[in-house]
Amino acid sequence: MHQRILILDYGSQVTQLIARRVREAGVYSEIHAGDVDDAFVRDQVAQGLKGIILSGSHASAYEEGSMRVPAAVFDVGVPVLGICYGMQSMAQQLGGTVSFSDHREFGYAEVRAHGHTKLLDGLADFTTDEGHGMLKVWMSHGDKVTELPPGFKLMASTASCPIAGMADESRGFYAVQFHPEVTHTVQGKAMLARFVKDICGCEGDWNMPDYISEAVARIREQVGSDEVILGLSGGVDSSVAAALIHRAIGDQLTCVFVDHGLLRLDEGKQVMQTFTENMGVKIVHVDATSQFMGKLTGVADPEAKRKIIGREFVEVFQDEAGKLQGAKWLAQGTIYPDVIESAGAKTGKATSIKSHHNVGGLPDTLNLQLLEPLRELFKDEVRELGVALGLPPQMVYRHPFPGPGLGVRILGEVKHEYAELLRRADAIFIEELRNAKDPASGLTWYELTSQAFAVFLPVKSVGVMGDGRTYEYVVALRAVQTFDFMTADWAPLPHPLLARVSSRIINEVRGINRVVYDVSSKPPATIEWE
């Protein structure tokens, strides 16, 4: 079993980033709800847990009814790192004082490190004229610790937060008011690596080659000689899941690829070629375009479209799965963020922005056991796994594509005509991004953007082509840059590139005479339009 770190989640929007940073240090980490009981914590320690991290929260640590850290966390003898709310809870439960701050801090701050602690010693972004080491960090808090618990010493401070970090090194307890997990905290990654390796004693035994060997053995043991079916979408997650399961059990796996008529240009052909010709995976290809388009006729509401597409996918998949009499397992490309979000939804601590298109309702309907070989991995780890399994890099590293496909990139009602126009416009945009290089970085603009796509707007505008007047549709281009997809900035594509894309779309896609570029960031906008 791998050495691991337990992360207790108190509702922060960036808790997943803590786990990702820990794994980037080569250490396995798991996120669990912050209200687990003492028995759970003790059991984790008995299984070799090396340390605990307490996340931030939107809640107030001193308000009645706020979530408390399990008492066992502080008496099982493993190092603990509290972040933001985690620091306040640690202080309050160990005898310190937490108060509401008259000066709330949200955003960039400069923190002065105090004393010499294992966590911060030698880390600095710049030094003041007086010789004080300073850290550039990201703050997001309204409460603050105003009195240290017994045994703790001051570790960091800001002008408005005299206690921005504290430590009881004899017990391995550390806490910071800022967020080391976000990229805005320049030394944050180094801090978390130092905590898990130098303080918790983890050796960094989490790596992809070992994961593949363990996952293959686990799948073989779990499945035995049974047949497995998998809904293959062509997306990264289901593709990597298929490759991993096929590595483990070969022809015991059958993939069902449902074409709902809302895929990108030639996507169906590419999926079939990759898996059948190059990897020898058994695939049942179902063209259900007419069924999906028929159900979407007259439907304009985006949430209604998502639900219809999800429901019809289940129906088509169920019909095909029923023909595979020997199948006892349903495989899904569930990844770790899906697991975390599902847990949050069940506890009522998560807010639903958009419904997710998946096959989550299938196990009960089909009476199949569930196989989720990627449920421990984040997206970047899934991509790394895909490359290690031999999937083409252009498939593994391509931009995310929503389950409902072009159905949520066509605003309003979905029509076959609209899908054809959008497919061709989108293909031109992506082709030009792949061909255009940024001289400064040497990377293509496709590599420099995290997600890029075209959106069909069901409105017409007047134009002129040759000597004639046109009255045709509008397409919007969307390209964003992001580290985590929780926030995103619109990509500053070069004007000549945008001009070339626009010219090609208008000249090559008859029916479109205007192209616009979306310069909205997330928030307030979401990345997808629907």
UniProtKB/Swiss-Prot annotation:
GO terms for molecular function: ATP binding; GMP synthase activity. ATP binds at S233, G234, G235, V236, D237, S238, S239. Keywords: ATP-binding, Glutamine amidotransferase, GMP biosynthesis, Ligase, Nucleotide-binding, Purine biosynthesis. Residues 4-205 form the Glutamine amidotransferase type-1 domain. This is GMP synthase [glutamine-hydrolyzing]. InterPro entries: Class_I_gatase-like (IPR029062), GATASE (IPR017926), GMP_synth_C (IPR001674), GMP_synth_GATase (IPR004739), GMP_synthase (IPR022955), GMPS_ATP_PPase_dom (IPR025777), NAD/GMP_synthase (IPR022310), Rossmann-like_a/b/a_fold (IPR014729). The active site is at C84, H179, E181. It comes from the Bacteria. Pathway: Purine metabolism; GMP biosynthesis; GMP from XMP (L-Gln route): step 1/1. It catalyses: XMP + L-glutamine + ATP + H2O = GMP + L-glutamate + AMP + diphosphate + 2 H(+). Homodimer.
